[in-house]
Amino acid sequence: MSVGFIGAGQLAYALARGFTAAGILSAHKIIASSPEMNLPTVSALRKMGVNLTRSNKETVKHSDVLFLAVKPHIIPFILDEIGADVQAGHIVVSCAAGVTISSVEKKLMAFQPAPKVIRCMTNTPVVVQEGATVYATGTHALVEDGQLLEQLMSSVGFCTEVEEDLIDAVTGLSGSGPAYAFMALDALADGGVKMGLPRRLAIQLGAQALLGAAKMLLDSEQHPCQLKDNVCSPGGATIHALHFLESGGFRSLLINAVEASCIRTRELQSMADQEKISPAALKKTLLDRVKLESPTVSTLTPSSPGKLLTRSLALGGKKD
């Protein structure tokens, strides 16, 4: 089995690193395409021994499972470009927030009568094999196709199948969730520094507290509130701290953050449906930095195939 990534940004790097670390794929079985070869993530993939190319078509040609790992509003143009190269045996996995199975199928069916499409939402902790992934299968995807993706994603964390209408909410919760955790950790570390702790120690303590709390919850059958109550002694420091968080609307802020991410996910789908980004903008900018200043509706013509750039590790060479 070979895996390809259209896009060589943070998600592609995280998944490639996770797959190789888990031992489910060798680096030479992975290919990623990017119009820009100087990105830090591209350099990291190159060091891992992943095959790299500027041609999306080349990536399709060398893949069995194809991950669309680009921004949502770029997806329609990518599908126009690679549609003729997608074969009946390909499993096309959309990782873009808000991009529906039907929208991908509609594009591909102009070239292929029964494209096998799976919609997936994962997160960056896959890089350390602690990701959270859900997926939904499309009209023509077989049960075995879903099982193959689940096997891949389970090697880098938790993975389960859901109904597609739940995926936007998953995006707001676990898709964006690591960013919430990092922001909370940054604030906790600031609090530690304010009270006299060295920065490095404050970060380590905060990270371990979050890691330990998450593991306690996952390993138990208790509700989070029960575990929270177990930390609070009557009249103690923790209950006073929680009162302060409650008075600042801590819970409401998190609930609103999940909702805001979910709503934005649906807005991104609307943008993708309307194809608001011009091919000119697509060519001028990096995949993760498309300019939206002067959007126009037009059709992207397939680009000419680029040269496949490969890197092979010498015998006895170091692995990243």
From Swiss-Prot:
<feature type="binding site">
    <location>
        <position position="34"/>
    </location>
    <ligand>
        <name>NADP(+)</name>
    </ligand>
</feature>
<feature type="binding site">
    <location>
        <position position="164"/>
    </location>
    <ligand>
        <name>L-proline</name>
    </ligand>
</feature>
<dbReference type="InterPro" id="IPR053790">
    <property type="entry name" value="P5CR-like_CS"/>
</dbReference>
<dbReference type="GO" id="GO:0034599">
    <property type="term" value="P:cellular response to oxidative stress"/>
</dbReference>
<dbReference type="InterPro" id="IPR028939">
    <property type="entry name" value="P5C_Rdtase_cat_N"/>
</dbReference>
<dbReference type="InterPro" id="IPR036291">
    <property type="entry name" value="NAD(P)-bd_dom_sf"/>
</dbReference>
<feature type="binding site">
    <location>
        <position position="238"/>
    </location>
    <ligand>
        <name>L-proline</name>
    </ligand>
</feature>
<keyword id="KW-0028">Amino-acid biosynthesis</keyword>
<keyword id="KW-0597">Phosphoprotein</keyword>
<comment type="function">
    <text>Oxidoreductase that catalyzes the last step in proline biosynthesis, which corresponds to the reduction of pyrroline-5-carboxylate to L-proline using NAD(P)H. At physiologic concentrations, has higher specific activity in the presence of NADH. Involved in cellular response to oxidative stress. In some cell types, such as erythrocytes, its primary function may be the generation of NADP(+).</text>
</comment>
<comment type="pathway">
    <text>Amino-acid biosynthesis; L-proline biosynthesis; L-proline from L-glutamate 5-semialdehyde: step 1/1.</text>
</comment>
<keyword id="KW-0496">Mitochondrion</keyword>
<feature type="binding site">
    <location>
        <begin position="95"/>
        <end position="97"/>
    </location>
    <ligand>
        <name>NADP(+)</name>
    </ligand>
</feature>
<feature type="binding site">
    <location>
        <position position="10"/>
    </location>
    <ligand>
        <name>NADPH</name>
    </ligand>
</feature>
<feature type="binding site">
    <location>
        <position position="36"/>
    </location>
    <ligand>
        <name>NADPH</name>
    </ligand>
</feature>
<feature type="modified residue" description="Phosphoserine">
    <location>
        <position position="304"/>
    </location>
</feature>
<keyword id="KW-0560">Oxidoreductase</keyword>
<feature type="binding site">
    <location>
        <begin position="6"/>
        <end position="11"/>
    </location>
    <ligand>
        <name>NADP(+)</name>
    </ligand>
</feature>
<feature type="binding site">
    <location>
        <position position="97"/>
    </location>
    <ligand>
        <name>NADPH</name>
    </ligand>
</feature>
<feature type="binding site">
    <location>
        <position position="230"/>
    </location>
    <ligand>
        <name>NADPH</name>
    </ligand>
</feature>
<comment type="similarity">
    <text>Belongs to the pyrroline-5-carboxylate reductase family.</text>
</comment>
<dbReference type="InterPro" id="IPR029036">
    <property type="entry name" value="P5CR_dimer"/>
</dbReference>
<feature type="binding site">
    <location>
        <position position="8"/>
    </location>
    <ligand>
        <name>NADPH</name>
    </ligand>
</feature>
<dbReference type="Pfam" id="PF14748">
    <property type="entry name" value="P5CR_dimer"/>
</dbReference>
<feature type="region of interest" description="Disordered">
    <location>
        <begin position="296"/>
        <end position="320"/>
    </location>
</feature>
<feature type="binding site">
    <location>
        <position position="56"/>
    </location>
    <ligand>
        <name>NADP(+)</name>
    </ligand>
</feature>
<feature type="binding site">
    <location>
        <position position="71"/>
    </location>
    <ligand>
        <name>NADPH</name>
    </ligand>
</feature>
<dbReference type="GO" id="GO:0005739">
    <property type="term" value="C:mitochondrion"/>
</dbReference>
<dbReference type="InterPro" id="IPR000304">
    <property type="entry name" value="Pyrroline-COOH_reductase"/>
</dbReference>
<keyword id="KW-0007">Acetylation</keyword>
<feature type="compositionally biased region" description="Low complexity">
    <location>
        <begin position="296"/>
        <end position="305"/>
    </location>
</feature>
<feature type="binding site">
    <location>
        <position position="237"/>
    </location>
    <ligand>
        <name>L-proline</name>
    </ligand>
</feature>
<keyword id="KW-0521">NADP</keyword>
<feature type="binding site">
    <location>
        <position position="56"/>
    </location>
    <ligand>
        <name>NADPH</name>
    </ligand>
</feature>
<keyword id="KW-0963">Cytoplasm</keyword>
<dbReference type="GO" id="GO:0004735">
    <property type="term" value="F:pyrroline-5-carboxylate reductase activity"/>
</dbReference>
<keyword id="KW-0641">Proline biosynthesis</keyword>
<feature type="binding site">
    <location>
        <position position="11"/>
    </location>
    <ligand>
        <name>NADPH</name>
    </ligand>
</feature>
<dbReference type="GO" id="GO:0006561">
    <property type="term" value="P:proline biosynthetic process"/>
</dbReference>
<feature type="binding site">
    <location>
        <position position="34"/>
    </location>
    <ligand>
        <name>NADPH</name>
    </ligand>
</feature>
<dbReference type="InterPro" id="IPR008927">
    <property type="entry name" value="6-PGluconate_DH-like_C_sf"/>
</dbReference>
<comment type="subunit">
    <text>Homodecamer; composed of 5 homodimers. Interacts with LTO1.</text>
</comment>
